[in-house]
């Protein structure tokens, strides 16, 4: 065990921790600062980026034993609020950068360090900075992220206000406009919880689901024997296709015009056939 005194979002915290814990685990598990996300867990995606002593830090690979006492750590929860967004958070919302929103906190923390050290970056410098700090996004194509940083820089330089960033409908119509995504503010402030975040905040006796997925790309199912699993300690129930009420089918997965089925071809839980690697079985 190690004793650490850390200054997290301006507040001094004294913690007794396992030396093998990562900074991300301390933030998420001990302090419930779940705005810090864990994506790859190997320091390659930037979702876990926080600021430590003024530098972008990949918290998922930073052992707490290597963090100095009184290190100053900033997370997404510490740079703005739902009512008073940081200019980067406001720009993220305005440009639609927070789509799924999982990568947004890591990007914003990286961008904050960039603008603190370079108030007038070029677009190329923004791209290079995100590459350097391993920030990855699967939703946006990156252009809106760079646009957001450039506009946030203007706000910080006093060339425009946060209010100037936001779309304002003039005819009460928002369809086809840049009207802000309703979930955007929650996602850029770290208050939008994903499944891995929700579980940190649930009662200790909350049941958890472990998904059994197909490990082959195609197969015919002759039977599913759940007896051994049901007898394992801690198992409350094993759910298979037999437990699905009504029609064990999901639509919307196959929507190509060439599809010959009725749109209800895929099971919720596999019953007769495995269609692809990773299909849910139980």
Predicted regions and their residues:
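Signature of N-terminal electron-transfer/Fe-S-associated modules in redox systems
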Residues: 1-169, 173-174, 189
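Flexible, low-hydrophobicity surface segments
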Residues: 154-282
